[in-house]
């Protein structure tokens, strides 16, 4: 059964917000020292990547600026962590990549609401 695309996009948006909220006010050193926060952020990245994998080709083609493949790839890296999770990559994803992509995801939600 194919999941409603709106739900997948909402999951991406919500987990982006969550990840940003989890690290709010933390330095990199505080983040990597806080196991609970680190694990919560990794879980959010898992949800984002899994939901990105469920996005249809139609949506991917309509919104090519969204790094769909990279979001799914990050999920695989943090979940399968073959040689340990790269904490700096997780930090950069949440501090730099998510804030850049979140407005694009928000626009998709608005566009889907107009259907």
Role assignments for model-derived ranges:
Residues 1-115:
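Solvent-exposed interaction patches of small proteins and small membrane subunits
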